[in-house]
């Protein structure tokens, strides 16, 4: 059994892990991260903070570098996190600045690229800013990683990149394509290279509907765009686990997608603000009624690896021997938020308390 098989055996466990299974997963992550220097772009964001806390809890990385442009958030983060072993480093910078990235990436083993502009309505009215950060910034990350021989680069992407109807999704689709294509420029095939994780909305993240509803409910009136609207949801903890699993499994070029449940937004309103009146305001620019995590074209090269799906790249450098024990999904497979199982109210409540 090779390393990939061992990792898959450990990370593709049932949704609700036993204590022993959680220990097995943690051992895998511990081994992959041992003595590594890890840099997270956008490290002061919601995912970055969750991820950094997890890395500190694991304890085996040699150094954790938070790369972001907001010095106050870095200050707050430094004050709030317990770092008795002095593993944290804060690096002010913007992914638009290649020279700054070049300096930050010196000696780095793993880069998790989470920096992005993501507020859909704002980006519709500021398109060039979205392109500068989400596309050109991603290319800067790639160039800096290649020039510094970074072993692994993992892009954090979104379901908005699938059949995009807004600028945010289009920029993330471009970022995904750039990451996958970058593997052709690897100097050493033994280096894992560049891969992607793609998931849905993160419960409780900054600017999410949960945050909006929490602000609105005190007034007794909450807003809903469309009663039919559905969304994929993942907890912050689930997003962190996906990132760590991908770092354990990646060979370079894959897109990792978790198996998620979805929900109707009207059910979320009933859970978060059960006693409030609801005002229907209509879909905002760039929104969909339902989201999807796989295009029909991607289905034909997607494998089911238990708790995740893995999209294979369409490049001649891609090797599949390590995946021979995992089947492709059916050709008529569809992964959309209106067709997967929807969360029950009690499940929603449980996720909201995580």
Q: Predicted regions: what is each one?
A:
Residues 41, 105-114, 155:
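Rossmann-fold scaffold of SDR-type NAD(P)-dependent oxidoreductases
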Residues 60-73:
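Conserved glycine-rich Rossmann-like NAD(P)H-binding loop of the short-chain dehydrogenase/reductase
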Residues 89-110:
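Conserved Rossmann-fold cofactor-binding substructure of NAD(P)-dependent oxidoreductases
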Residues 26-36, 141, 147, 177, ...:
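Strand-loop microenvironment adjacent to phosphate/nucleotide-handling motifs in alpha/beta enzyme folds
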Residues 113, 117-121, 125-173, 177, ...:
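Conserved Rossmann-fold NAD(P)-dependent oxidoreductase catalytic core, especially the SDR/UDP-sugar
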Residues 68, 91-92, 132:
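Conserved residues in the N-terminal Rossmann fold of short-chain dehydrogenase/reductase
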Residues 38-54:
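N-terminal Rossmann NAD(P)H-binding glycine-rich loop of SDR-like oxidoreductase domains
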């Amino acid at each position: 059994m090779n390393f990939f098989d061992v990792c898959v055996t450990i990370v593709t466990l049932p949704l609700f892990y036993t204590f022993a299974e959680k220990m097995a997963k943690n051992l895998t992550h511990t081994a992959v991260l041992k003595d590594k220097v890890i840099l997270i772009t956008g490290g002061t964001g919601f995912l970055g903070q969750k991820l950094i806390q997890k890395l500190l809890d694991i304890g085996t990385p040699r150094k954790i570098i938070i790369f972001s442009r907001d010095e106050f958030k870095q200050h707050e983060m430094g004050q709030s996190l317990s770092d008795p072993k002095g593993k944290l480093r804060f690096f002010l910078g913007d992914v638009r600045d290649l020279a700054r990235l070049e300096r930050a990436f010196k000696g780095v083993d793993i880069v998790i690229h989470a920096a992005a502009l993501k507020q859909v309505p704002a980006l519709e009215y500021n398109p060039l800013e979205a392109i500068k950060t989400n596309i050109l910034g991603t290319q800067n990350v790639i160039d800096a990683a290649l020039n510094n021989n970074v072993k692994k680069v993992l892009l954090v992407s979104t379901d908005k990149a699938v059949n995009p109807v807004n600028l945010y999704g289009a920029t993330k689709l471009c970022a995904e394509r750039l990451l996958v294509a970058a593997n052709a420029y690897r100097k050493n095939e033994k280096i894992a290279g560049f891969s992607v994780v793609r998931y849905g909305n993160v419960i409780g993240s900054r600017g999410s509907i949960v945050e909006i509803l929490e602000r609105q409910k005190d007034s007794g009136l909450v807003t809903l765009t469309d009663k039919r609207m559905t969304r994929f949801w993942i907890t912050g903890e689930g997003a962190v686990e996906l990132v760590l699993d991908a770092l354990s499994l990646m060979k370079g070029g894959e897109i990792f997608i978790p198996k998620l449940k979805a929900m109707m937004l009207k059910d979320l309103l009933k859970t978060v603000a059960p006693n409030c009146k609801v005002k229907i305001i209509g879909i905002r620019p760039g929104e969909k009624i339902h989201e999807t995590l796989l295009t029909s074209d991607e289905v034909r090269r997607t494998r089911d690896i238990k708790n995740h799906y893995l999209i294979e790249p369409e490049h001649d450098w891609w090797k599949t021997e390590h995946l021979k024990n995992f089947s492709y999904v059916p050709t008529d497979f569809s992964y959309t938020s209106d067709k997967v199982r929807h969360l029950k109210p009690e499940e929603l409540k449980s996720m909201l308390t995580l």
